[in-house]
């Protein structure tokens, strides 16, 4: 039996119609009727997560797996506000996230009643659509409720994915479950038109007229990153292409995730060092920027200094991202489609021998990129986080697929040096909050092992991610140097002892007790020998529980290893 609240039944029916199959549910009385309905629908699987902030990132991680809408359902009051970090991340990553918040009747808002605040539009600009449903009393109000839910769920799936907010006022009595079936609801569909090749002409004319073009690939969804990788492998023979571990992906459906066939890893610092030492001017005159944010600050700084370059960017939604300060135009489209079209034209021009690119420029960049790939292989460092991450990637199995997540700050930068395959990372806003919860949520719906490389501050900040029941496929490599190590790399900060004390957040915490409490296998290492032995146990397929491998290092040694690595390369 279902709830007797008509707006809840309309919402439940339309979630099914729009293909929402997973909902993360947080405890509460006001949203209990919604949770009851969702749990009664065979097409929907519910996941219980108590911490709302963690729950938002759990849902984000699930949505990242297939880039299909995932909902998170919370009670009224500040529970909704706790979802804001995950919603902001979903917006900038273009992830389809559906926020469902229960609410009191509008008559009781701001009347000193319990657990109330003004919930409609509480998530502001971070959602692409926010609706507050009526509690229908007649046919017109039912039509209105249906339309609002359709508006939100169609907006969620546009332009690759967007977060939306559906607020559901529920008047008392809350708990009456006497409806035997859900209503048959009208489902409104939005069909995306086929890409028009004519739209590519404007920016392509500039590309083929350029002498020194450069392609830069930022963060992409994993499914599109695979298609882009195939095009990049063809384009890079004639045009230099810079990418990162969040840019290109192997084919997970064929087990290519761990095969090493992906294009990478690439040390961009080494590439740019060689380019800057070139005896002739090899700066690009045309930049095609594909995808989202970049990890490398140095790359952004380098490209911002090239004032005469013309930059075009490709993204879903046609957003004006003037990252390099030389933006000339924006292509509103799928990056994979645009690159496929470029490949087709490139083949035609090569057959016609009509390419006018500067061959010396291409040769110089090609040599620098080859050096950037080779420089990641032979790195001499003492025991440190860098050596631990390098050893992890060297021992990762090549005979089975896996998924790889990384936290922000140093974790993603270290992964970017050595990862052979695509890395999921919350680079939309780049916060340290929610990285562990995102990986944990991802692991609940993934069929392969999910590895998460994460720093200590990010781990302890988000350790409630370990609270829900987890699958055995989650494996966390925790890099613990008892502080925010990335602050050691910020030039000038060492001159402020006060800032170092406040910003580095030094501590003496260990994850051991948390792992024991939540029923996870715990491993640790304090030196190179323990690291080697620990990695073997960490990667053992016979593990029956989620695993946390905590690698303890010295913060100063980590800084020295990082600096020495960049001096070597």
Model-derived features: positions:
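Phosphate/pyrophosphate-binding active-site segments
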Residues: 1-2, 302-410, 512-514, 526-569
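N-terminal cofactor/phosphate-binding cores enriched in small/glycine residues
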Residues: 2-88
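Active-site diphosphate/adenylate-binding microenvironment
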Residues: 8-11, 16, 29-30, 34-38, ...
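A short, small-residue-rich loop immediately preceding and capping a beta-strand
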Residues: 21-24, 45-47, 65-104, 282-291, ...
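Glycine-rich, anion-gripping cofactor-binding loops and their flanking helix/strand elements
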Residues: 82, 217-312, 420-446, 460-464, ...
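Thiamine diphosphate
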Residues: 100, 107-120, 417-569
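Glycine-rich, acidic loop regions that bind phosphate or pyrophosphate groups
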Residues: 101-152, 243-366, 469-471, 490-491
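Conformationally flexible catalytic loops at phosphate/diphosphate-handling active centers
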Residues: 148-151, 155-209
